[in-house]
C-alpha cells in the first residue's frame, strides 16, 4: 500500500495520509444494499455499543470466504477498496465464467492465478501461489495462512483483518495447531481449509485521517473521557475542576472493573482447544 501525502494547503490535508492507489469498482451481481439500522443502539434505541453513528451509505460486497470453487483456476482481474472492512478485496474470474470476490492476499497482483481444493500446490516453480486455498492437512509446517475455518464447510472466520496472518506450527492426529494473530495457540481440525499467505493492506495503521469529518464518514462518533462527564453519565464524572475519578480502580460506565476484567464466557466449549491464551 502506498501512502499519499497532500500538499499543505489546509490543516486537514496537512495532517492527512491516505492510500490513493486502490479504488472501488463493484460488480452489480456481487453487491447488495444493506440497511444499517441501530448504529450502536438496541431495539429500544438505547446505546449498547458506544462511539457509533452516522457514516456514509455502504453497499455490501459478497465475499467468498468458503472458497468452495474446487479445482477450477481463477485469475485476479481487479484489486478494490471495500468500505465494510479494512482489507482490500480482489475480483476473481474463474475458468467456467463465474466471478467472485476474495480477500486480497499480500503480494498478489493483477493477472495472478489462484485455485482452491485438495492437493493444491502453494508453489509454481520458485514462485509462491498466494491466495490458494487448501485443507490444513495438505500444508507444510510453518506456512503463513489467513481466512481460516473453525467449522468444516462454514467458511473462513479467523485472520481476516488487514495484515492478519496465522502460522501452522504442528499437526498431530485429527488436529492442527495454529498460532493466531492475537498470540493465541489453539487446535483446529486438519480438514478445515485456509488460504495461503497474509491479508493485504498491511500499512493500514499508518494512515492518518487528518480531520474529524473523515472519521465521521466512517460512522465513528467522538470518544469522550468519563472524567469530564457528569456523575449521572459516568462513575468517573463530577467534581470541581480537574478532579480525580474518586475510586480505587477505573470502571466502565456501568460500574464494572475497566482494566484486566476477563470478558470471555466461562466454561466455553472451545476452552479445551485453546493451548495458550491470547496476549493482545
Curated annotation (Swiss-Prot):
Primary location group: plastid
PROSITE patterns in alphabetical order: RIBOSOMAL_L2
InterPro entries from the UniProt entry: NA-bd_OB-fold (IPR012340), Rib_uL2_dom2 (IPR014722), Ribosomal_uL2 (IPR002171), Ribosomal_uL2_bac/org-type (IPR005880), Ribosomal_uL2_C (IPR022669), Ribosomal_uL2_CS (IPR022671), Ribosomal_uL2_dom3 (IPR014726), Ribosomal_uL2_RNA-bd_dom (IPR022666)
Molecular function terms, GO-annotated: rRNA binding; structural constituent of ribosome; transferase activity
Entry's Gene Ontology cellular component terms: chloroplast; mitochondrial large ribosomal subunit
Keywords: Chloroplast, Plastid, Ribonucleoprotein, Ribosomal protein
Name of this chain's protein: Large ribosomal subunit protein uL2cz/uL2cy
Amino acid at each position: 500500500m502506498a501512502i499519499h501525502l497532500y500538499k499543505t494547503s489546509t490543516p486537514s490535508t496537512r495532517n492527512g495520509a491516505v492510500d490513493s492507489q486502490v479504488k472501488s469498482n463493484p460488480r452489480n451481481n456481487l453487491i447488495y444494499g444493506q440497511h444499517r439500522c441501530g448504529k450502536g443502539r438496541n431495539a429500544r434505541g438505547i446505546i449498547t455499543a458506544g462511539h457509533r453513528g452516522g457514516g456514509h451509505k455502504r453497499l455490501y460486497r459478497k465475499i467468498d470466504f468458503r472458497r468452495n470453487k474446487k479445482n477450477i483456476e481463477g485469475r485476479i482481474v481487479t484489486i478494490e477498496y471495500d468500505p465494510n472492512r479494512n482489507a482490500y478485496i480482489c475480483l476473481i474470474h474463474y475458468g467456467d465464467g463465474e466471478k467472485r470476490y476474495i480477500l486480497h492476499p499480500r503480494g498478489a497482483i493483477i493477472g495472478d492465478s489462484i485455485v482452491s481444493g485438495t492437493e493444491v500446490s502453494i508453489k509454481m516453480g520458485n514462485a509462491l501461489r498466494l491466495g490458494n486455498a487448501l485443507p490444513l492437512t495438505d500444508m507444510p509446517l510453518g506456512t503463513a495462512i489467513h481466512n481460516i475455518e473453525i467449522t468444516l464447510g462454514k467458511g473462513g472466520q479467523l485472520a481476516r483483518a488487514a495484515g492478519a496472518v496465522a502460522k501452522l506450527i504442528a499437526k498431530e492426529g485429527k488436529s492442527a495447531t495454529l498460532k493466531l494473530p492475537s498470540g493465541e495457540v489453539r487446535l483446529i481440525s486438519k480438514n478445515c481449509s485456509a488460504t495461503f499467505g497474509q491479508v493485504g493492506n498491511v500499512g493500514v495503521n499508518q494512515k492518518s485521517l487528518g480531520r474529524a469529518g473523515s472519521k465521521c464518514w466512517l460512522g465513528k462518533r467522538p470518544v469522550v473521557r468519563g472524567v469530564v462527564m457528569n456523575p449521572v453519565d459516568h462513575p468517573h464524572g463530577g467534581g470541581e475542576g480537574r478532579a480525580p475519578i474518586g475510586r480505587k480502580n477505573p470502571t466502565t460506565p456501568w460500574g464494572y472493573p475497566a482494566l484486566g476484567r476477563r470478558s470471555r464466557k466461562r466454561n466455553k466449549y472451545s476452552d479445551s482447544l485453546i493451548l495458550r491464551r491470547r496476549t493482545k
